[in-house]
């Protein structure tokens, strides 16, 4: 019996020892939890500042944490809440991570304030992105940009325009693509998916009547107010002094939170270290407070290409890259190069990507030109109504195709024969469609300048030009010009078209590598182009008359020249700033990569340009329905039409004159006469020597800035090993100006 009692006492002592050890373990565990909970109190609001933190918990955990934020939003609710039981805490879901807001033995007072939330995506917010964006910007129009991929796995692209920027989203369905576009638009000016999360991130619950979806100006004093420590509440009087100090320190970080939101105002410029090579930092020093907006973010990770945009001095610059950081750098570099002529070391100049032209807009430009051609050729014979190459220049206000207007139209594929050269400027040397369209566009520009000669104010207000205070004229805001060509321009752009390599593949690739990017010349009285030969840059008059082949530069090279010098030419440079193309639309034989390389990238070595001149990089696009190839010989004539002119002019491409033998309205002689009538009566950008120049060549050389930029371009071609720009005999420009 004694042994039984002894064993009972021994087992009782062992049991009591185990209980004591268990209590000590629980006590130590409770202390560790207290420390972790206090630390998380201050770190939780700043978790969103770390870009590397991602949330991988399931939907149950997400909903539990969201409910937890709502429960802990009001401090008064925390004080009146009974502490959770230990069994419930142990039996709860492991993903809940619920912290005890009250501590036993402390009079039921608040020990610590725990702010815990998950980084909600737009798709799980109380209001999805479409609803939020509709409330902020009602009446937005979503349009389907494209549909790519196989039939069983399509990829849709939907775009929406918000605040002057176009955001494009992609997805396996139109609904998801539309949702993605709305998310990108919201992220450009909203940081948090809902009001609750925004308030909690800034240290307080939402005030009464605050609507996060209303205009920003409606709640500057509630949502974005300065966060001061609140007055002590009765329920917090018994809190520990250390907790109050920690809470005060957390509130002291309010400015960091405001900067993270980036909604209160522009961020201060970050000082760059000497020799800073980061274009984003340098641009921020020059223009503080810039915001970068993500315009496109593909859904497929293996083909990521982000597009970021930044607005500087009222102009929008865009860049693309495999990450948002690289895209921001490209956009910043584009702004630095365009506005400040700054080229950062280690950054390829001019490769910042612009937003692709909407396919619907490109198709509308093509349809406008082809429809206008059918309209103006209805009274012509079938022989004159056909064309092998068609070109036109369309004027728009912004990228609104509804207000588009065709201002110049032409056709043709031939050049003048050398025996028909004129030393009085009475012939048109190059009758290719693109070149004739540009000369018809000069006719249109002269008409617009002549409106400023009228004494009636309404006439000058109808002009596309406005007068500058410092002298001269410039285009009105949002006036854009677009070139449409039915086939890829002759020269290097057409040579490397993927549809034209039909011979042996190995020899074709070798030819491509050898002559890639070279300047090319047209064949006299024929079609096609050949690379420039020899270092000679000037042809001789007597040599051409004796049978030497007349050399004319290709259309590809001429368009590349327009992208630096402008469409207006030397004479009009006396009056107007350079006029550049906004876009080029090609109907067939089109390859965007090759076209971009020969149109823009060959000019990267030109260097810094004078004010108002730039390296223009027009938007490039094909059309949805490419024009069919037209076999047979090209017509031996060229047609041109200009808005405001009732008659349609037909030029014999071999002689460079009208069919009746008279000079064309687009020849040097006629256009220079219009210039002479304007000179001295209109304000000029160049210093006037007094008297009107007597000769055509003197008038052209008088545009000193234009001539210096032209020489700069020609030297860049030579330095890059692309060949020498061949000029016509100088005798062609040595004729007297007539009024």
UniProtKB/Swiss-Prot annotation:
Signal peptide: none annotated. GO terms for cellular component: cytoplasm; nucleolus. It holds the Pfam family A_deamin. The keyword RNA-binding applies. It comes from the Eukaryota. Residues 408-735 form the A to I editase domain. Coiled coil: none annotated. Its EC number is 3.5.-.-. CDD domains: DSRM_RED2_rpt1, DSRM_RED2_rpt2. GO terms for molecular function: adenosine deaminase activity; double-stranded RNA adenosine deaminase activity; double-stranded RNA binding; metal ion binding; RNA binding; single-stranded RNA binding; tRNA-specific adenosine deaminase activity. Brain specific. Expressed at higher levels in astrocytomas as compared to the normal brain tissue. Residues 23-35 are annotated as: R-domain (ssRNA-binding). The active site is at residue 434. It is found in: Nucleus. Residues 1-36, 53-105 are annotated as: Disordered. One of its GO terms (biological process) is RNA processing. Zn(2+) binds at residues 432, 490, 555. Keywords: Hydrolase, Metal-binding, mRNA processing, Nucleus, Repeat, RNA-binding, Zinc. It is an enzyme of class 3 (hydrolase). Lacks editing activity. It prevents the binding of other ADAR enzymes to targets in vitro, and decreases the efficiency of these enzymes. Capable of binding to dsRNA but also to ssRNA. This is Double-stranded RNA-specific editase B2. The lineage of its organism: Eukaryota, Metazoa, Chordata, Craniata, Vertebrata.
């Amino acid at each position: 019996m004694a042994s039984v009692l002894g064993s009972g006492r021994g087992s009782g002592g062992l049991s009591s020892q185990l209980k004591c050890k268990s209590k000590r373990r629980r006590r130590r565990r409770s202390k560790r939890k207290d420390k972790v909970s206090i630390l998380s109190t201050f770190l939780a609001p700043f978790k969103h500042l770390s870009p590397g933190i991602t949330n991988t918990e399931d939907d149950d955990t997400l909903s539990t944490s969201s409910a937890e934020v709502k429960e802990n939003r009001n401090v008064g609710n925390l004080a009146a809440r009974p502490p959770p039981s230990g069994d419930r805490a142990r039996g709860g879901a492991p993903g809940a991570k619920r912290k005890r807001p009250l501590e036993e033995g402390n009079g039921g007072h608040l020990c610590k304030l725990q702010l815990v939330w998950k980084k909600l995506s737009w798709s799980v917010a109380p209001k999805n992105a479409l609803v939020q964006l509709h409330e902020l910007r009602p009446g937005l129009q979503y349009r389907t940009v494209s549909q790519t991929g196989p039939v069983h796995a399509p990829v849709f692209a939907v775009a929406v325009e918000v605040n002057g920027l176009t955001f494009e989203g992609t997805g396996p369905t139109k609904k998801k693509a539309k949702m993605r576009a709305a998310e990108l638009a919201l992220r450009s000016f909203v940081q948090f998916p809902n009001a609750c999360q925004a308030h909690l991130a800034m240290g307080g619950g939402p005030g009464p009547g605050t609507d996060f979806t209303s205009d920003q100006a409606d709640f500057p004093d509630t949502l974005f107010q300065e966060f001061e420590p609140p007055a002590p509440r009765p329920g917090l009087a018994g809190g520990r002094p250390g907790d109050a100090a920690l809470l005060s320190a957390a509130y002291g970080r309010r400015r960091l939170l405001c900067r993270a939101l980036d909604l209160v105002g522009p961020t201060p410029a970050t000082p760059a270290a000497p020799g800073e090579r980061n274009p984003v930092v340098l641009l921020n020093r020059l223009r503080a407070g810039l915001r970068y907006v993500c315009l496109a973010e593909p859904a497929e990770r293996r083909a990521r290409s982000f597009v970021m945009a930044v607005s500087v001095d009222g102009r929008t610059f865009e860049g693309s890259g495999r990450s948002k950081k690289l895209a921001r750098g490209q956009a910043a570099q584009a702004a630095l190069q365009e506005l400040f002529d700054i080229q950062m070391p280690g950054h390829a100049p001019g490769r910042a990507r612009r937003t692709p032209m909407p396919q619907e807009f490109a198709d509308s430009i093509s349809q406008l030109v082809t429809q206008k051609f059918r309209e103006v050729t209805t009274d012509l014979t079938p022989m004159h109504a056909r064309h092998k190459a068609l070109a036109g220049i369309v004027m728009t206000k912004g990228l609104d195709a509804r207000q588009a207007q065709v201002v110049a139209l032409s056709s043709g594929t031939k050049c003048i024969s050398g025996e028909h050269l004129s030393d009085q400027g009475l012939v048109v040397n190059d009758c290719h469609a693109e070149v004739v369209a540009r000369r018809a566009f000069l006719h249109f520009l002269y008409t617009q300048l002549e409106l400023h000669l009228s004494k009636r104010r309404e006439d000058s207000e109808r002009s596309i030009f406005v007068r500058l205070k410092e002298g001269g004229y410039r285009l009105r805001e949002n006036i854009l010009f677009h070139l449409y060509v039915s086939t890829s321009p002759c020269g290097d752009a057409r040579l490397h078209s993927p549809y034209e390599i039909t011979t042996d593949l190995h020899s074709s690739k070798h030819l491509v590598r050898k002559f890639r990017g070279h300047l090319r010349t047209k064949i006299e009285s024929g079609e096609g182009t050949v690379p420039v030969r020899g270092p000679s840059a000037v042809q001789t008059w007597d040599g051409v008359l004796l049978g030497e082949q007349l050399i004319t530069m290709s259309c590809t090279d001429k368009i590349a020249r327009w992208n630096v010098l402008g469409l207006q030419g030397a004479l009009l440079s006396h009056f107007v700033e350079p006029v550049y193309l906004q876009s080029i639309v090609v109907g067939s034989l089109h390859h965007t990569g090759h076209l971009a390389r020969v149109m823009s990238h060959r000019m990267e070595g030109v260097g810094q340009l004078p004010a108002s001149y730039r390296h223009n990089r027009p938007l490039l696009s094909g059309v949805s329905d490419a024009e069919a190839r037209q076999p047979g010989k090209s017509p031996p004539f060229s047609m041109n039409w200009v808005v405001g002119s009732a008659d349609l002019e037909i030029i014999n491409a071999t002689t460079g004159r009208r069919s009746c033998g008279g000079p064309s309205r687009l020849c040097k002689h006629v256009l220079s006469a219009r210039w002479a009538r304007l000179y001295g009566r209109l304000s000029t950008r160049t210093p006037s020597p007094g008297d009107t120049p007597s000769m055509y060549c003197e008038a052209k050389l008088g545009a000193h800035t234009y001539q210096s930029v032209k020489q700069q371009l020609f030297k860049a071609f030579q330095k890059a090993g692309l060949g020498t720009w061949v000029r016509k005999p100088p005798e062609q420009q040595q004729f007297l100006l007539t009024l």
